[in-house]
Amino acid sequence: MSSIVVVGTQWGDEGKGKITDFLAEQSDVIARFSGGNNAGHTIQFGGETYKLHLVPSGIFYKDKLAVIGNGVVVDPVALLKELDGLNERGIPTSNLRISNRAQVILPYHLAQDEYEERLRGDNKIGTTKKGIGPAYVDKVQRIGIRMADLLEKETFERLLKSNIEYKQAYFKGMFNETCPSFDDIFEEYYAAGQRLKEFVTDTSKILDDAFVADEKVLFEGAQGVMLDIDHGTYPFVTSSNPIAGNVTVGTGVGPTFVSKVIGVCKAYTSRVGDGPFPTELFDEDGHHIREVGREYGTTTGRPRRVGWFDSVVLRHSRRVSGITDLSINSIDVLTGLDTVKICTAYELDGKEITEYPANLDQLKRCKPIFEELPGWTEDVTNVRTLEELPENARKYLERISELCNVQISIFSVGPDREQTNLLKELW
């Protein structure tokens, strides 16, 4: 048995989907373990581009299982729209499996997300307003509705009526707004559940069977470590745990099942939404990176904030996620810059620190300490080995590996599959 966890080491959008797809060819099962349809990833398959939000990357391989684990929050209507879109383009989806313990996102979660963000005013978090946070809140409050409940008509009716009564009082008191009614929700979402019924099962058992059969399992992360509810830039984070350790909770397998953890990063840094970003760029270099790298959110379409590579962030991610191997994407985006920079430490109140602060106010006062390296002008998009890279590009990657104390096992010089290069066998 072998398994690999793929996690983002920054604030999401690192290219995890492409790396997951790249590794999926040799795996038997691909499983998601956190997040919801707030996570967007772009996949190149069969010469076409696909943008997925809930469906695991493994859906494109009909001989492999694509699993949505119990740690994922599922909007049934959004999921069906995604599945229908794939079917219309000739992609079969019969290999999908959904955990019967996954929480369901309902219309009142989307409304609550909108109202709460509005109430925050200038302190808004930058939520995608997909209902993710409120769904996880209901899970912890033990009033959440799970996929297993959605499939049973009487159970769903009883729980939905109870929740709407609670939400109506909450919405009125907190926002002076009304909650979507029972009639607005019940028939549409029960019907959606019935359409998804064939996919719903105990996915923990599927994964356990795969391990017993000595199959290869790939765990697909969403967002990034710096958006982790515990280890990220709190409170500007997501509502779940994208770190590798959440594989055990989010899919129902034991920690001994994990063999390797691949941390995916860009050769620079990007972020969507609000929150601290010590190496953020506002100059021509930032404009170059955003436009050449097409830095616009898959889910929101919002322009991403961009900045220099931050080794303080990556060291933090390596430690809290147990990263064994590094995949560096988008090296080609930096081509043409005279100088490239790596943040090696921060200056906080006149002192140099090398670890990421937990306190938000301290983080806002941090100034990046940069190491400058010469850039390169040579086209790298057809490079297939480290040795073929321009010397300056190769030294840049080697310095990142050295600063972060993790080996580079994959590097990518463009968006296409053939531009993703494996430096060592991972399975």
From Swiss-Prot:
Say which species the protein is native to: Staphylococcus aureus (strain COL)
What gene does this protein come from? purA
Q: Which pathway does it serve?
A: Purine metabolism; AMP biosynthesis via de novo pathway; AMP from IMP: step 1/2
| Magnesium keyword on record | yes
The annotated subunit structure for this chain is:
Homodimer.
What keywords is this UniProt entry annotated with? Cytoplasm, GTP-binding, Ligase, Magnesium, Metal-binding, Nucleotide-binding, Purine biosynthesis
Which reaction(s) are listed as its catalytic activity? Answer: IMP + L-aspartate + GTP = N(6)-(1,2-dicarboxyethyl)-AMP + GDP + phosphate + 2 H(+)
What does the entry list as the binding residues for GTP? 12-18, 40-42, 304, 330-332, 412-414
Q: What is this protein called?
A: Adenylosuccinate synthetase
Biological processes per GO annotation = 'de novo' AMP biosynthetic process; IMP metabolic process
Q: Which Pfam families match?
A: Adenylsucc_synt
Q: State the PROSITE patterns in the record.
A: ADENYLOSUCCIN_SYN_1, ADENYLOSUCCIN_SYN_2
